[in-house]
């Protein structure tokens, strides 16, 4: 007898996510200044960075800043609260949200000021309506954060579908109509892209398993119990967060420089057009990827769970010895995953320096890597909903 499972919860979540994406598409097409003035303004680095966090600088619209300020505020607060977990646990959801939104407001104001000031310096827009434009950008950012927050609760994968849609829009608007390279060059780019995606698939779908003794599962001795970790637990969120922080650093340096040095000051250190900037970004990506992975694995909490449940590793004492054992394993796994992801991103970025006329194609490759990586994470989320929804008929008997 065939059983038909109705994935009603999943369908509702997909519908809600589609509704959020429709709102994002409409908002990203509402320009707040003339498009003709912005077509002459080209900043490939900034457009690439802001696209990967859900923003759009091809036109100055209400969602131009994207989710970068929000992602930056979350990682900053996470690093601040890392040593005081007890205080964080006592905070209410309203208190946490207030801190996130307040810091997001400050960061979005700084980034918005930098973007508008850059357009003014290059005579793309006039400075007479600067405060109004800044207010619109900040309001759009907070609205976008609210949409991502609602999608986390009622939709699928939180902010990731918004970033995915931003990448799709950027790829079609910027790259496809303008790829004029030779057939052999395009073939080489495709081969490198496939190789990079294969490595990312390997990292995402491969698990590192540590076998342990489960005292509650004595009847099934032939079936081993194991603790499984992904090779890169942080996933695509580390790329988005690292780009957001790198872009924030660039904005802060330029913001301070234009007040202290001169109003035309613009640093080229925190940029993808020089090896120093790329190296700084890759180091930031590795470090953030490592710490986010360690935060998600949380070996301290896992060792406490083992101590409470009575589970243990062969030859390892429960408690502190288990925590050290898991910490050493997690350290190797997290560094390996973050370094491999950084290497995959480094290849197209450094290639752009060696072959400058391929900058457009290289940025296209980078965006495709991020696009597929986010797509993998969304697919895993949908698979998880499919898995739990298949047990809905059984669970309904007890709930």
Swiss-Prot record:
GO biological-process terms attached to the record: intracellular protein transmembrane transport; protein targeting
Organism name: Staphylococcus epidermidis (strain ATCC 12228 / FDA PCI 1200)
Membrane topology: Multi-pass membrane protein
Subunit structure: Component of the accessory SecA2/SecY2 protein translocase complex required to export cell wall proteins. May form heterotrimers with SecE and SecG subunits.
GO CC annotations, alphabetized: plasma membrane
Purpose: Part of the accessory SecA2/SecY2 system specifically required for export of possible cell wall proteins. The central subunit of a protein translocation channel.
Compartment annotation: Cell membrane
Pfam families tied to this protein: SecY
Residue stretches spanning the membrane: 14-34, 60-80, 102-122, 128-148, 152-172, 183-203, 237-257, 272-292, 335-355, 362-382
Family: Belongs to the SecY/SEC61-alpha family. SecY2 subfamily.
Record protein name field: Accessory Sec system protein translocase subunit SecY2
InterPro entries linked: SecY/SEC61-alpha, SecY2, SecY_dom_sf
Annotated keywords: Cell membrane, Membrane, Protein transport, Translocation, Transmembrane, Transmembrane helix, Transport
């Amino acid at each position: 007898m065939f059983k038909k499972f109705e994935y009603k919860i999943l369908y509702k979540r997909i519908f809600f996510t589609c509704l959020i994406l429709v709102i994002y598409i409409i908002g990203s097409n509402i320009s707040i200044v003339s498009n003709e003035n912005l077509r002459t303004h080209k900043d490939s680095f900034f457009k690439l960075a802001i696209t990967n966090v859900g923003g759009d600088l091809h036109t100055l619209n209400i969602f131009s800043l994207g989710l970068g300020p929000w992602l930056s505020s979350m990682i900053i607060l996470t690093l601040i609260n890392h040593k005081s977990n007890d205080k964080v646990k006592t905070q209410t959801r309203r208190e946490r949200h207030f801190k996130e939104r307040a810091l997001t407001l400050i960061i979005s104001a700084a980034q918005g000021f930098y973007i508008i000031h850059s357009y003014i310096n290059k005579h793309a827009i006039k400075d007479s309506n600067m405060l109004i434009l800044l207010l619109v950008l900040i309001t759009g950012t907070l609205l976008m954060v609210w949409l991502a927050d609602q999608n986390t609760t009622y939709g699928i994968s939180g902010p990731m579908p918004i970033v995915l849609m931003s990448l799709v829009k950027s790829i079609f608007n910027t790259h496809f109509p303008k790829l004029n390279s030779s057939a052999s060059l395009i073939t080489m780019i495709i081969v490198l892209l496939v190789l990079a995606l294969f490595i990312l698939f390997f990292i995402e779908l491969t698990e590192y398993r540590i076998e342990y003794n489960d005292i509650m599962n004595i009847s099934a001795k032939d079936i081993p119990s194991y603790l499984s970790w992904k090779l890169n637990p942080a996933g695509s969120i580390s790329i988005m967060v690292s780009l957001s922080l790198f872009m924030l650093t660039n904005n802060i340096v330029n913001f301070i420089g234009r007040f202290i040095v001169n109003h035309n000051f613009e640093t080229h250190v925190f940029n993808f057009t020089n090896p120093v900037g790329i190296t700084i970004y890759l180091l930031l990506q590795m470090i953030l990827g490592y710490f986010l992975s360690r935060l998600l694995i949380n070996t301290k909490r896992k060792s406490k769970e083992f101590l409470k449940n009575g589970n243990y590793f062969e030859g390892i004492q429960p408690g502190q010895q288990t925590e050290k054992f898991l910490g050493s394993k997690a350290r190797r796994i997290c560094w390996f995953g973050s370094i491999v992801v950084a290497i995959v991103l480094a290849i197209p970025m450094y290639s752009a320096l060696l072959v400058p006329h391929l900058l457009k194609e290289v940025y296209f490759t980078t965006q495709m890597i991020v696009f597929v990586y986010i797509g993998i994470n969304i697919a895993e989320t949908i698979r998880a909903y499919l898995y739990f929804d298949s047990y809905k008929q059984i669970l309904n008997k007890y709930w």
